[in-house]
Amino acid sequence: MTSTRKSVLTSSSTITVTTCLLLVGLAAAGYASEGGEGAHHVDTAKQMKDFAWRCLDFAVLLAIVVWALKKANVKGSLAERQSNIEKMLKEAVEAKEQAEKKFLEYNEKLEQANKEIEAMSAAMKQEGELEKVRIIAEAKAAAEKVKEQAQQAAHQEILKARIELRDEAARLAVEIAEKKIKENITKNDQDKLVGDYISKVVTLH
């Protein structure tokens, strides 16, 4: 849906710029032909009327440019991008919280395992020394394995969340940068068209 809206806005901006160019071209052609005739017929009333029509044409062109800028809905598009970034940040924070929650669960299991080891150690005091050492070693190895698995799982979850956040943030930053560049170019083109039109009006008078 976002890509479709972006295409519609781009097409609308292109059509608007093309229309403005056509209007400027037609106005310039009309002014050039009228300027040639004015060299042979000097009429103050006619010149004032011609000047009034040119001012009206300029006002119409300016209104079209303002309408096109409003139609593009630039602020709405940027607000939508910002909303998407905030949503991704929120999801990344939630993923991190889930990873930390799992890490705490693994720590609780580890503490429970340590308690069981202590209970086993107390029970084995009555058994032979060699057997006791062997069982304790196995229990410690199992506890270390659980701890290592818990740390790896939590680390992987956090790393995954960071990578997804970084990639999405980079992608959205590029899209926003491209959007801003396109908007600046469109605005400069429109400013140039208005400036050229004013220059032609001043030159003809």
Swiss-Prot record:
The chain crosses the membrane at residues 51-69. F-type ATPases have 2 components, F(1) - the catalytic core - and F(0) - the membrane proton channel. F(1) has five subunits: alpha(3), beta(3), gamma(1), delta(1), epsilon(1). F(0) has three main subunits: a(1), b(2) and c(10-14). The alpha and beta chains form an alternating ring which encloses part of the gamma chain. F(1) is attached to F(0) by a central stalk formed by the gamma and epsilon chains, while a peripheral stalk is formed by the delta and b chains. The lineage of its organism: Bacteria, Pseudomonadati, Thermodesulfobacteriota, Desulfuromonadia, Geobacterales. Pfam families: ATP-synt_B (PF00430). It is found in: Cell inner membrane. F(1)F(0) ATP synthase produces ATP from ADP in the presence of a proton or sodium gradient. F-type ATPases consist of two structural domains, F(1) containing the extramembraneous catalytic core and F(0) containing the membrane proton channel, linked together by a central stalk and a peripheral stalk. During catalysis, ATP synthesis in the catalytic domain of F(1) is coupled via a rotary mechanism of the central stalk subunits to proton translocation. Component of the F(0) channel, it forms part of the peripheral stalk, linking F(1) to F(0). InterPro entries: ATP_synth_b/b'su_bac/chlpt. Its main location: membrane. The keyword Cell membrane applies. GO terms for cellular component: plasma membrane; proton-transporting ATP synthase complex. It is a single-pass membrane protein. One of its GO terms (molecular function) is proton-transporting ATP synthase activity, rotational mechanism. Belongs to the ATPase B chain family. It comes from Geotalea uraniireducens (strain Rf4). CDD domains: ATP-synt_Fo_b (cd06503). This is ATP synthase subunit b.
